Structures are given as structure tokens and as C-alpha cells.
Amino acid sequence: MHLSSLLVAVLLPLALSKPTPRKKPGSFTVHLARRSEAEYARDGPTDLQRAYAKYGIPSTQGMDGYRPEPISRFQGNSKIAGGAPGAKDDGKDEKGEVENNPTSHDIQFLSPVTIGGQPFIMNFDTGSSDTWVMNTDMDDEEAKKDHHLYDPRKSKTYSKLDGLTFSIKYGDKSHASGPVITDVMDIGGATVRKQAIGLPTKVAASLANDKSSDGLVGLAMNKLNTVRPDKQKTFFENLAEDLDEPVFTAQLRKGKMGSYEFGAIDKTKYAGDLVNVPVNNKNGFWEISSALYSVGQLDKIQKVENGTGTAILDTGTTLLILDEEVVKAYYAQVKGARYDASRYAGWVYPCNASMPSLFLAVGHDHMAIIPSSLLTFQNYGPGPDGTDVCYGGLQSNNAGGIQILGDVFFKALFVVFDYRGPSVSLAPHA
């Protein structure tokens, strides 16, 4: 198999309602805040459990009883007040920008959003299609604690969509459900006047305990939208026709400020050339072919024999979750690596172990490299033998039939999501 370099060290070639925008933004950028350790305790098993629940993947032994204590965002320094956090008006209608202060860890990337003039910190999620926000009408008072709560009584632009409800179920452990409203929603200066937004009255503890996020902005395909009886458009779908291009980009970098940009592709944010990969959207996801892999070196490419051969690009998942065959092949090259179901509920290894890079197919013609520097998620500190134990950023899907390219993947690559096709394009970060 002949290989030649296309993107140095990163990509290698291989043989419903009618919401209206307030203004035509052309393009706009949202700079993201990263969770700090004071805002959210980095915990690999918890993040893996969230991903399993989201996609209905059976939990492994030891996961069900794993419940670490959440750490409130308000123990840190990122409490927001007043108007849109960090919002700037540059006097130009075609572009809005939001500034955020970076925090000390990049477990997950979050964005300021205003709904009905009220400020929130929310997660952009390319793995779902509902927008919902914590609110004053939730049944559980405990669930409200340490969140910014949307109050419909404080909004002059609130309107209830009579008869419409939403219900997101992430497996059987995580859910949010309730009525649906419309309100003015602003992200980075781009505004939709009547964005459909779920106001959950019931929220699972696993969502309520995520104190660093007040809700979610879904950016997957409309097919996944759970509003019934009439599906609703995502924020991006409502804006797409008014953008210069129907695209958005994700720049999620390790230890650095990240951003999403809607309507334009900033060539200064990536190196080399973009590689375009077709998306299969029949299930509503940004799903691409990914049936080949190699550990350490590109000259030992293997075909995944027992998996689906596809992967979902999901900014709402922190880890890289691949077919068990790939994960076992990778950790076979890491001295001391083991699957620990009882204590860590995942793959761990000595932190001083030498880690190889991982090559993954993106589409049928290219492979992406995930550098070894991105594949350690968490240091748990000394184990019984005094050696620090690390939790892998790469974990198994337990033969769950779904591979998930989460933030570990995005830290390696700049990604363009293009509704034309649809497709994604990838390149190394600049």
C-alpha cells in the first residue's frame, strides 16, 4: 500500500416552526471557555458512563455504582452575571464575537448563550439536535442548584408552543423532558427570534450534576430532534440560509482557547489542505466511514473485522470511544496497560509508560493521526505500587456498535461541518 504525505503528521492519503434571524450575520465566531478543575472534577469513568448512556451502549461491570461527587462551577471564578458574558458589539451586523476567559483544563468546551436576554453557559453538541436549558420550572429543587436558570417570566419575547414536548433519553440513565417554547436566542451576535427551546421539568441527576453547563445546543441533523408532534429546526439550521456558507467549524485545541465559527472557514486556523469526507446522515449524525486503524506506525494498517466501520463526530463527548478490537490492539502496545472494571471502569496504565500514536481512517481515502500526547485523559495519582495510574483518553465501546470521535479527536484536528452534501473536512490545527 503506497502512502504519501498530504497533511504533515495529521492526515495521510490512503490507496418546522418558522423562526427568523434578526439579522443576516454572514458569519460569526464564538470563543469558548474550558472547564476548570474548580468547575468540574476531571473523571474518566464518569465521562465514559455519560457517553455510554447517551448512545445506549451497555455499561461495563463497575460502572453502575460509580458516582463521584460533582464540584460546583461557583467554587471557581467563572460565575457570570449581567448581560451576555464577554459579549462585544463591534458595530458590524455581519459578524458577532464572544470573548471568554480560558480556564485551567479542557475537559469540555462551553459557550456563552443568551435566551430571552438571560445569560447561560451551554455545551455545543454535534451528537444531538435538541436545544434545552435549565429553568425555574424544573420539579426538583436540588437540580436547580448552581445553575443559571431560564425564567420565562423575565422574558418579553417568550412564547409557549402549545401541545409540543421534547424528551431526550440518553440510554436509560440520563434524560430531560418537558414543554417547548420559543424565544430570542443569541450566540456570538447572531440571533434567531423564535428558536425552539426545551424547558425540562424533569432532568436526570447525571445532567443536573453537571454544574458547569446550563444546557445544550444541538448541532446534529434535524432527524434526531425529539420535539413531538412536530420536529423543530436547530439553531444552525435556522441561520444557515443567511450565512455566507452553510458551514460551521470546530477548533477545539488542547490547553488553548477554542472556538466555533458559523458561515465561514478561517484558513488561519488550520495547516495544509482540508481533506473532505462524505457524511452518512441517515441516522441523523455526522457519521463517517472509519474501518481502518494502525498503532504507532502507518505501515501496519489493519481492517476492523467486528465493528460497524463508521464513527460519529461528537463534540458533546470528551473521550475517543472505538471498537473493542482497536482499543485492545492499541493498549497491547502500552506496557502495563490493563482493563480495570472494579476500580477505574476502563483502560488504565502506568503514567510513565511509553504511548504510541494512533492512526484512524477518516473516510475511505485518508487516515488521521491522534498523537500520543492527546491519549492520556487523567492522572489518578499513585497506585498500590507507588506508580501513578493514568486513565486513557481512548476507551472501548464494549461491542456497542458505535464509534464516537469525541474531544480527544477534535484536539488533533480542525473540523468543518458542511450541510452541503453533507460532509466534513479535516486538517491539522495551525
Curated annotation (Swiss-Prot):
Q: Where is it found, in Gene Ontology cellular component terms?
A: extracellular region
The record's CDD domains line, in alphabetical order, gives: Aspergillopepsin_like
Q: Where is the signal peptide?
A: 1-17
Matching entries from Gene3D superfamilies are given as: Acid Proteases
Show where the Peptidase A1 domain sits: 109-427
- Enzyme Commission number: 3.4.23.-
Q: Which Pfam families does the annotation name?
A: Asp
| Region called Disordered, residue ranges | 59-105
Q: Which residues form the active site?
A: D125, D314
Alphabetized PANTHER family for the sequence:
ASPARTIC ENDOPEPTIDASE, PUTATIVE (AFU_ORTHOLOGUE AFUA_2G15950)-RELATED, BETA-SITE APP-CLEAVING ENZYME, ISOFORM A-RELATED
Q: What is this protein called?
A: Putative aspergillopepsin A-like aspartic endopeptidase MCYG_07979
